[in-house]
């Protein structure tokens, strides 16, 4: 993941870190974030920089928390609440401040752009266990967000469209279950890829199943099929793709080297049934 190496120095990071110590004090967290945002006005570029630092801080903290931890839950809930309930930021004239056509912080302006910029995994080289776990954790975080945004029938919950990262689910599942993992440079790399797919099923399984049942598609070839299924004209979630993933994840368990990742895959395959 490409996240600023100085992220821990950001005031936004310190605010979120403090929130994890007192997750029930959401209003106090909002107040500190608003103060931070208002200090940038009227400089629009500085406000955008603030948002970039805030979203980077969310993603970095999520990547450092175990996917099953209470801290991940707290970050997901905070981002949900920030999206839908945080008071809007107003300028000196009392007008709502907007970025990219959205009121700050409603609809999380620039969060999607930030997530996309850092969403890459170095599968062309051997990775250490820390990098492996970071990738699995951030996939779990985004899967949790998607589960909050999309109901088990595949429809978006009103007001939560900014949290729908179901396309990222396709990318992670395709990388692990539709490509030839024998081409990856090391077992830790394939463990990371398979583990990332597993947490999508574990934390957003019913949502992804609902999207598959409703044939959710995306424009162009962003959700195309992987090499092992190159003859399929998949452009998103489908019933037969879901069946292929179920089969492939079960078989992928035999490729996993780390016991904790193997256990994770076992839990995910059970959740898919």
Feature roles, as predicted:
Residues 2-235, 269:
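Eukaryote-skewed repeat-based solenoidal scaffolds used as protein-protein interaction platforms
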Residues 229-247:
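Alpha-solenoid helical repeat scaffolds
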Residues 241-273:
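Eukaryotic acidic, Ser/Thr-rich intrinsically disordered low-complexity regions
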């Amino acid at each position: 993941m490409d996240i600023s190496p100085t992220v821990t120095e950001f005031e936004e990071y310190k605010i979120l870190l403090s929130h994890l110590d007192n997750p029930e004090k959401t209003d106090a967290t909002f107040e500190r974030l608003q103060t931070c945002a208002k200090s940038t006005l009227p400089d629009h570029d500085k406000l955008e920089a603030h948002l970039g630092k805030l979203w980077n801080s969310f993603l970095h903290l999520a990547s450092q928390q175990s996917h099953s931890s209470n801290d991940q839950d707290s970050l997901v809930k905070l981002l949900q609440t920030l999206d839908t309930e945080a008071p809007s930021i107003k300028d000196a004239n009392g007008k709502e401040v907007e970025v990219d056509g959205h009121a700050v912080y409603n609809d999380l302006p620039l969060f999607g752009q930030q997530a996309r910029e850092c969403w890459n995994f170095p599968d062309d080289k051997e990775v250490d266990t820390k990098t492996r776990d970071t990738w699995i954790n951030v996939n779990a975080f985004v899967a949790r967000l998607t589960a909050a945004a999309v109901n088990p029938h595949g429809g978006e919950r009103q007001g939560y469209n900014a949290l729908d990262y179901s396309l990222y689910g396709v990318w992670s599942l395709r990388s692990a279950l539709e490509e030839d993992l024998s081409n990856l440079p090391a077992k830790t790399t394939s463990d990371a890829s398979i583990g990332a797919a597993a947490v999508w099923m574990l934390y957003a399984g019913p949502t992804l199943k609902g999207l598959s049942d409703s044939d959710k598609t995306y424009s162009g070839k962003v959700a195309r099929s992987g090499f092992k299924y190159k003859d399929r004209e998949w452009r998103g979630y489908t019933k037969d793709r879901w069946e292929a993933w179920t089969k492939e994840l079960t078989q992928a368990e035999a490729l996993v080297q780390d016991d904790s990742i193997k256990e994770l895959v076992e839990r995910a395959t059970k959740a898919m049934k």
